[in-house]
C-alpha cells in the first residue's frame, strides 16, 4: 500500500467515525417523534420519518432523506433534507421536496453544527409552525407562504390534505433496496401484541419518575441560533 493510499484510507475511516459519532449523539438529545438511520449501503444517506405531534401538521407522517456532503463534516456545505411525498409547507420546495435550511444554517461549521440540530429544526418548523413563521424570512414554496398569509382557512385545508396523503403512504413499498430503510407494517395482534404489552408495562413502571428537562428550544428569543439553552 502506498503512502497516498494509506492516507486516503485513514481519512475515510476517520470520516466514517465522525458520522457514526453524530448518529450516536442523537441518543442524548430530545428527539421524540423523529427517527433516522444511516443507509446500509451509504453512510452519507440517512433515512428519516417525522411524526408530527402538534400544530397544523399534527398526525402527519413524513418520510425524508438526509444527505451529507462528500467532505462532511469538514465542509461548509449544509446537509440536504428532501421529503419523499408531496409536503405542502412554505419551507419545502414543491418541485423536489427539498427543505429550506439556509436561514438556520447559512453554512456548515464543523464542531459547532451537528446533525441533531438539523433534526431539531425539522421538528420545530412542523410542530411549532406558526411560531417559526412569525420570524421566518425565507421561503421555498411561495404558494404555501402566500396562502398562509392571505387565506388561513385555505392553507389549513391544503395542509390537511397533505397530512392525509402522508398517512396513506406509510405502508408503501420501499423505493430503494436497502436493509436499513424504515418500513412499517399493519398491526398484527399475534405478532405485535406482546411487544405492545411489554411497552405498556415498561411505561407503567416509569410513572412517578420524571426525567430532568434539557431546557432546550430550537431558538432563543431574539437570537437565531440553533438550540440555544434557555435561561
Curated annotation (Swiss-Prot):
Residues 14-168 form the UBC core domain. CDD domains: UEV_AKTIP (cd23814). This is Protein crossbronx homolog. InterPro entries: Ub_conjugating_enzyme (IPR050113), UBQ-conjugat_E2_core (IPR000608), UBQ-conjugating_enzyme/RWD (IPR016135). Gene3D superfamilies: Ubiquitin Conjugating Enzyme. Belongs to the ubiquitin-conjugating enzyme family. FTS subfamily. The lineage of its organism: Eukaryota, Metazoa, Ecdysozoa, Arthropoda, Hexapoda. It comes from Culex quinquefasciatus (Southern house mosquito). It comes from the Eukaryota. SUPFAM superfamilies: UBC-like (SSF54495).
Amino acid at each position: 500500500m502506498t503512502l497516498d493510499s494509506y492516507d486516503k484510507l485513514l481519512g475515510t475511516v476517520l470520516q466514517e467515525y465522525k458520522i457514526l459519532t453524530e448518529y450516536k449523539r442523537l441518543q442524548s438529545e430530545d428527539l421524540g417523534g423523529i427517527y433516522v438511520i444511516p443507509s446500509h449501503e451509504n453512510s452519507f444517506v440517512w433515512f428519516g420519518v417525522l411524526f408530527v405531534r402538534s400544530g397544523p401538521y399534527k398526525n402527519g407522517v413524513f418520510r425524508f432523506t438526509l444527505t451529507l456532503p462528500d467532505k462532511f463534516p469538514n465542509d461548509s456545505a449544509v446537509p440536504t433534507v428532501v421529503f419523499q411525498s408531496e409536503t405542502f409547507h412554505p419551507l419545502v420546495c414543491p418541485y423536489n421536496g427539498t427543505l429550506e435550511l439556509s436561514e438556520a444554517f447559512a453554512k456548515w461549521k464543523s464542531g459547532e453544527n451537528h446533525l441533531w440540530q438539523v433534526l431539531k429544526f425539522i421538528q420545530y418548523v412542523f410542530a411549532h409552525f406558526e411560531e417559526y413563521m412569525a420570524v421566518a424570512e425565507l421561503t421555498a414554496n411561495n404558494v404555501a407562504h402566500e396562502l398562509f398569509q392571505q387565506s388561513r382557512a385555505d392553507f389549513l385545508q391544503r395542509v390537511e390534505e397533505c397530512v392525509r396523503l402522508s398517512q396513506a403512504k406509510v405502508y408503501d413499498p420501499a423505493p430503494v433496496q436497502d436493509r436499513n430503510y424504515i418500513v412499517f407494517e399493519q398491526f398484527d395482534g399475534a405478532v405485535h401484541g406482546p411487544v405492545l404489552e411489554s411497552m405498556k408495562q415498561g411505561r407503567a413502571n416509569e410513572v412517578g419518575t420524571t426525567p430532568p428537562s434539557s431546557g432546550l428550544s430550537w431558538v432563543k428569543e431574539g437570537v437565531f441560533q440553533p438550540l440555544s439553552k434557555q435561561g
